């Protein structure tokens, strides 16, 4: 079941990739993918290229894939291990969701962080208290790690 679904998603992604994103298997293992997200233009991550890993569980799509950034990023909902705080990767997962939709949700999280549900409270505080400083640091990290 999982393999068929993953193969179908791969075909759909190759046929109609989401804007600013790409993804596909690492080598022959269809349960382990690498994804790329281009920093959205309306964000301090503009110009950056961010790499993520995607690991599908054997009971996919009934359980969400594990998605993590491998590129360092300054963001209140993404920690230094690359873990992403995003409801659809946890409690709000649904088998109707796809990798494509997950990547688009991560893109919109880059543009619109959720400082009220942070993985990195210090960054969330900076985002809320001093948006200019947040944007500056996010741009600096993007230039340092994602370009």
Curated annotation (Swiss-Prot):
Superkingdom as given in the UniProt entry: Eukaryota
Active site: which residues? 85 (glycyl thioester intermediate)
Which keywords does this chain's UniProt record carry? ATP-binding, Developmental protein, Nucleotide-binding, Transferase, Ubl conjugation pathway
Which pathway does it operate in?
Answer: Protein modification; protein ubiquitination
CDD domains, per database record:
UBCc_UBE2D (cd23792)
Specify the UBC core domain's residue ranges. 1-147
Query: Which catalysed reactions does the entry list for this protein?
Result: S-ubiquitinyl-[E1 ubiquitin-activating enzyme]-L-cysteine + [E2 ubiquitin-conjugating enzyme]-L-cysteine = [E1 ubiquitin-activating enzyme]-L-cysteine + S-ubiquitinyl-[E2 ubiquitin-conjugating enzyme]-L-cysteine
InterPro entries xrefs: UBQ-conjugat_E2_core, UBQ-conjugating_AS, UBQ-conjugating_enzyme/RWD
Query: What Gene Ontology terms describe what this protein does at the molecular function level?
Result: ATP binding; mitogen-activated protein kinase kinase kinase binding; ubiquitin binding; ubiquitin conjugating enzyme activity; ubiquitin-protein transferase activity
Tissue expression summary: At embryonic stages 28 to 35, expressed in the somites, eye primordia, otic vesicle and branchial arches. By stage 35, also weakly expressed in the pronephros.
Give the EC class as a word: transferase
What are its GO biological-process terms?
A: pronephric nephron tubule development; protein K48-linked ubiquitination; protein ubiquitination; ubiquitin-dependent protein catabolic process
Gene Ontology cellular-component terms for this entry are: nucleus
Query: What EC number(s) does this enzyme carry?
Result: 2.3.2.23
Q: Which residues form the signal peptide?
A: none
Q: What does this protein do?
A: Catalyzes the covalent attachment of ubiquitin to other proteins. Regulates pronephros development, possibly by promoting ubiquitination and thus inactivation or degradation of map3k10/mlk2.
Oligomer and partners? Interacts with map3k10/mlk2.
The similarity comment for this entry is:
Belongs to the ubiquitin-conjugating enzyme family.
PANTHER family, alphabetically?
A: UBIQUITIN-CONJUGATING ENZYME E2 (PTHR24068)
In its UniProt entry, what is this protein called?
A: Ubiquitin-conjugating enzyme E2 D4
- Name of the coding gene: ube2d4
């Amino acid at each position: 079941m999982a393999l068929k679904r993953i193969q179908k998603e791969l075909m759909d992604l190759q046929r109609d990739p989401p804007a600013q994103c790409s993804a596909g298997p690492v080598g022959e293992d269809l349960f382990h993918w690498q994804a790329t997200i281009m920093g959205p233009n309306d964000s301090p991550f503009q110009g950056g290229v961010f790499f993520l890993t995607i690991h599908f569980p054997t009971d996919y799509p009934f359980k969400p894939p594990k998605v993590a950034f491998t590129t360092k990023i300054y963001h209140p909902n993404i920690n230094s291990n690359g873990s992403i705080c995003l409801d659809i990767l946890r409690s709000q997962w649904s088998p109707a969701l796809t990798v494509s939709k997950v990547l688009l949700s991560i893109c919109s999280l880059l543009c619109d962080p959720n400082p009220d549900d942070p993985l990195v409270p210090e960054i969330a505080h900076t985002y809320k208290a001093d948006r200019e400083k947040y944007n500056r640091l996010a741009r600096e990290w993007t230039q340092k790690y994602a370009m």
